Amino acid sequence: MRLLHLAAVTTAFALSVVTTLAWAWTGGVDELGIPLPYSHPGASGPGSAADGSPTVHVDPSNGWIDPTAPEPGVPAVPDQGLPGRPTTAAPSTAGPDRRPHPAPPVRNPSCRTGEKLVPTCGILWGVAPGAFTEQRGAVALAAFERKTERHQDIYHAYHRGEKQLFPTKEEIGIARERGRERLLFLNWKPVGASWEEIAEGDKKTDAYLDRLAKHIRKNYREQFFFTVHHEAEDNVREKSGSGYTADDYAKMYRHVVKRLRARGVDNLVTVLVHMAYVPHTTKSWFDRMYPGDDVVDWIGFDTYAYSDPGYGHGDLTELLNRRMGSRPTWPGFYNWAVNRHADKPLMVAEWGVWSSKKNPGHKAGFYRDMARQIPRFKNIRAMVHFDTPHNQKGMDSRVDATRESLAAYRRLGHLPIFQVEVDNALS
């Protein structure tokens, strides 16, 4: 991976004002949309076991998915006459939808969030709405819920730096909406100090964390998901003294979580969010990014599907267990995670299907296939769609790219497996 040096600015500042270009392979993006000074290597680049990347051993008893195994023959929900994959796109209608909110779906009373917000059964369903647009927050969430005709269990929001405290008043309102309560997933990326500096007690960062802890204790006592610097793989620089080694990240993550908890923030449920980009996950430093079981409650990963043949083109199994010919020892992220973190629930923290004018029917087909495939992935306990009309390269992940894709996504969201009663109160 090449590093584009930015003259006349310090390394810490340069990394503080950029976001990860995860869209290139996983699609993960920061809502601010500032380009990161890194570029990804091609899919055929070096990095196989022969060049030092680790060999991963998996235990099938932990829930490992054999990609060659046939799928169960019975679909999770009847097709109900959904049209076949179209050959031409039906564009999404623009403009605000002013229809009333859809009623919350009928929940399975036996499926509800439990300890550390892990569902007793089923999978939490959520969204990061309106990314890379002016319409974010409650407005974007309401629009997404109207068009998909269901309530979202998780609302994913992004924060950076030391100026804004969270959850914000708007986010608290989203979580506490009467009869439509939601779980917050708050994503914080520190700026102004390197990982190493934060881990060693950077004064400015510590002062912010102390203010943040006071704010949370005073204003929000419900449980919420929390992550620190998601997709950090894209920022790792394995050079002594860089301040951004994998070990630096693990120590920084520990420092942030432990400082917040030491100051009374006992309601955060931590998610370590990986970038599921195969060349990164097979690096020798990848496992060293783990901060420790005591500060990580969930394992998350960001991954996106592509509608055109090539890298990332396929179904849900490909999305969750993406492999690469040049990295033959990598079993796929899901398989790796259930082996490496067998006792941790998994969250797909960002996912979506990039649209294509050449292959507009792929998105609807992906959602229909997903309905049959998702029950196989027993360790997935939450999925959060990243909904944007355009990422930094103009790629569209909206579920309503075509009429058929919206219909398929609506049916997907109403499957029994995605019906979980949200209870975010501290036990």
Residue spans for each PLM region:
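Secretory targeting and sorting signals
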Residues: 1-25
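Aromatic-rich peripheral "rim/lid" segments of glycoside hydrolase catalytic domains that contact
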Residues: 6, 47, 52-67, 71, ...
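Boundary/entry segment of secreted carbohydrate-active catalytic domains
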Residues: 20-168, 422, 426
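N-terminal carbohydrate-binding/catalytic regions of secreted carbohydrate-active enzymes
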Residues: 117, 122-219, 362, 366-380, ...
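Aromatic-lined carbohydrate-recognition surfaces of secreted/lumenal glycan-active proteins
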Residues: 127-129, 260-284, 342-356, 382-388
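Aromatic- and acid-rich polysaccharide-binding/catalytic face
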Residues: 151-160, 186-190, 286-324, 386-388
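Glycoside hydrolase catalytic-domain groove-lining segments
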Residues: 168-189, 304, 308-354
